[in-house]
Amino acid sequence: MDFAPELITIGQKAKDAARKLAYAGTAAKNKALLAMAEALLNHEQKILEANRKDVEAAIQKGTKKSLVNRLALTSEGIRQMSDALKEVVNLGDPVGEGEFWTRPNGLRIQRTRVPLGVVAMIYEARPNVTVDAAALCLKSGNAVILRGGSEAIESNKILSKVIAGAAESQGMPTACIQLLENTNRQWVQQLMKMNGYVDVIIPRGGAGLIETVVKEATVPVIETGTGVCHAYVDGEADLAKGVSIVFNAKTQKPGVCNALEAVLVNEAVAQEFLPLLGEKFRDYGVEIRGCEKTCAILPYAAKATEEDWGTEYLDLIISAKVVQGVDEAMDHIYQYGTKHSETIITENYTTAQRFLNEVDAAAVYVNASTRFTDGGRFGFGAEIGISTQKLHARGPMGLQALTTMKYMVYGEDHIVT
């Protein structure tokens, strides 16, 4: 494939920056991160002004309200981004971690963590991802090429300019943080095939974006999957817990990948549980799309279509199905789930253990909200995404997931015979 000359320049600059950043010390990287945090606050008005342009353009295009909400920044949001950078400073640096052993022949082997190299982030209308990705890549010694959604281009331009300038002012390599300002989709298609320049691509966004990257990229991809997350309310569930957990998982922040999209209810408790949950959802403005049995119990529920069962709504909508038991619930999750986060509400230990062991997902819960699938809530610190694949990384991906292993071998005239 012929690459745009400008894209080759960006790729080469990233490679050069990654080479230098790989051996940058922890103190130097932390100093740069603190400067980035301060710079965001110092440029708050410019950032808000640029973001306002993006939001106004999105509204004029008739963009969904939920997407506009994800796009919009506030003064508080900028302070939160600044605080997030400071939190990354407090995280341990994975680069250089490892172990050392000596073989019987005296050969000494050291396995140590090293950066991946050049990370390309392809994401949608969340300006905060620009800052989060840049911070995590810098702390883990990686150069990053950022390609955000066209809806957030003005926000991403100013954010990347501010943080990249701050990092470089503290001695970080020039071009360690770069943004693809050209919103032409051909550039994205080329970026996905830049083997030799880019070491890994991490897509972060909706199903369409992720599927496109996985399908078209020749560069290795870490798939941060969509979240069609389920809650199964068992026949031996504490129904008050069930209402609390399901309501939280759906409404606390509906536009994120670990939000609940479907609730499966054991037929033994459906007549009692669904009205309790349904009234609370209706008061909050959550639309319920249910199976025939659900609609018979909740007359205000809309009838679910086949498409609904596999849809990541990212909105105040939830699908609901009455099932015979845990086996049918797990079969449904197997068919429609995306291997992200699944939860069971039950007081039966044996049923809970079956669900934990038999459901294939990055995170499986008992009596807890799926909203806990998060690097910070798991104690990993900030995350670059939540991986639903099994190779290299799975679940919330923190700093360690942005490194790989290198073997350093020490000998004294050791030769193979």
Curated annotation (Swiss-Prot):
| PROSITE patterns reported in the protein's UniProt record | PROA
Would you name any one GO CC term? Answer: cytoplasm
Q: Where in the cell is it found?
A: Cytoplasm
- Give the signal peptide as a residue range, or say none if absent: none
Q: What highest taxon heads this organism's lineage?
A: Bacteria
One annotated GO molecular function: NADP binding
Keywords assigned: Amino-acid biosynthesis, Cytoplasm, NADP, Oxidoreductase, Proline biosynthesis
Per the UniProt entry, the Enzyme Commission number(s) are: 1.2.1.41
In terms of SUPFAM superfamilies, this protein maps to: ALDH-like (SSF53720)
A GO BP term here is: L-proline biosynthetic process
In which pathway does this enzyme or protein participate? Amino-acid biosynthesis; L-proline biosynthesis; L-glutamate 5-semialdehyde from L-glutamate: step 2/2
* Record field: catalytic activity: L-glutamate 5-semialdehyde + phosphate + NADP(+) = L-glutamyl 5-phosphate + NADPH + H(+)
**Which family does the record claim for this protein?**
Belongs to the gamma-glutamyl phosphate reductase family.
NCBIfam families noted in UniProt: PRK00197.1 (NF001221), proA (TIGR00407)
What role does it play? Catalyzes the NADPH-dependent reduction of L-glutamate 5-phosphate into L-glutamate 5-semialdehyde and phosphate. The product spontaneously undergoes cyclization to form 1-pyrroline-5-carboxylate.
What is the protein's given name? Gamma-glutamyl phosphate reductase
Q: Lineage of the source organism? A: Bacteria, Bacillati, Bacillota, Clostridia, Eubacteriales
